[in-house]
Amino acid sequence: VYGAIFSADRGAVDELLPRGLEPIRATPRRAAVTFLAVEYHRIGDDAMPPYDEFSVMFPAVETGARSWPLASLFTHGASGYVWYLPVTTEPAKALGVDIWGYPKEVAEIDHDAHVAGRRTTVSAEGRDVITLDVERAPAIDQVQEGASYTVEDGTLLREPLTLDGNLGAWPFSAQAEWTLGDHPRADRLRELDLGSRALARLWFDGEFVIGAGEPVGTV
């Protein structure tokens, strides 16, 4: 996994969150968006062929939960509301939609590894959505827990996440860049006034476990 966290307009992010969630603040007036470019090499007990994925997530907490500007991003940056989740195969889409309510769509995801890291381009319906170029962050072996939030049939779900492996985050990095395309999703992201410098770049290699969704409210 290569990823990065960028600041975004707080009001614009809040408009995209379902009722029951509020954005984690990067500053008093800014929220954040996390981009994650993922290669799944093995799914469960080889339940399906490997596939690629690109996550657009807004770091968020349940309404009323305590969070601290910026500090909470470094502990919850890979947690939050999953807004867009393109994948490269139909079985991967079906698994995510049917079990967890993830907003998965089939798209083209191209990874281009280079000496310092990896460049990932997502395109759908013949249009580019986003390109993310991230240098690998220093990592150590560790276990981290978090949560993703999705909406299914009008219910807000919380899915516990566990990451077990080599995980690293490097703050305030110029070694992560995004470029938006001409797809409608890109236009929506453009409206968020994304920051040009990453609040952090991320790298992970290990086991990623998603727990069953737990209802936490209605939307």
Descriptions of predicted regions:
Residues 1-3, 23-143:
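Structured soluble/peripheral alpha/beta segments that form catalytic or ligand/cofactor-binding pockets
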Residues 86-219:
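Interaction-surface and assembly-scaffold signal
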